[in-house]
Amino acid sequence: MARWCAAQGWAVHPLAPGSKLPPANCRRCARPSAERPNPQYIEHETADCQCIEAGGHCHGVRAATKDPDRIDRWWSAEPRFGVGIACGASGLVILDVDDHAGADRPADDDYLPGVQLPEGATAEAFRSGWDTIAALCEVRCAPLPWMDPPTLTVLTAGGGLQAWFRVEDPELWHPAAGRLGWQLDLRAGRSYGIAPGTVTSSGTYRALGDCRTVAPLPSWLEEDLRRTGHHRKPEPKGKRPSARQLLATLRPPKGDAYVESVVRAEVDQVASAASGTRNQTLYSAARALGRFIPAGQLSESEVTACLMAAGTAAGLSDTETRA
């Protein structure tokens, strides 16, 4: 199944036998905790992981690949691995319809946030995500999204469903749980779906029907997903100035040459940080510059803008920099 998925253009990664989760990282990559100390751990950024570069599958979805040789090595070593599908790297979003008995119920107007329920519908009519998606389709006068056009749809081991869709801009979609509706989740970006045939302790994931191709995301559903914040607008090119441009225009109040010199030094260190040290360097810079905010020597927006630009120059994503 992993080779077949890769042949469709989807990036795959292993799931631990009998589980929906990736296998544990190697000792070098397993971050320690108070409960689980690990003296063999080496601080590094996932994007620079030597294990992934060498063909390993540490860090789960971040190791996803379409390389048939690497896939053969992984599943030859452990044929019981399940198959995870990296959404963003595969150009996919996956609508996850849950069937969780006993799940907490929201307020009546939060079963479908921002949508007026069908006439006569009450909270008692909602027993699972199946009822939620049916109600949304009724309001939109649309068929179930995996039916027209048909798309690869997987019945989960827990009684739910995952409907797979193609998108043109996968990097702009991000996952969220319950934002579209009660027991409706979206898998996108660095989240993953589970391929049919994967066996977990709860049962086997199975394809629904005969369709094995993935259809484009229906336009009506795309509109609702955008409305509920699953899609971000692309940042116009050139909108964010580079670290060098920011440094050229930054003028701390009162002509404080010392503050300016510290800002320049810290931003330069972040922008030129070597792989494996970027997160720590960014953290140190944030602490160093943050001390000027209470005194009014720098504004929070100035510090944030400089660090975001420096992080970009260092090769960090916006998410990594904000973290």
Label the predicted regions.
Residues 6, 160, 167, 199, ...:
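Modules that initiate DNA replication and primer synthesis
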Residues 1-239:
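Conserved phosphate/metal-binding and DNA-contacting active-site motifs used
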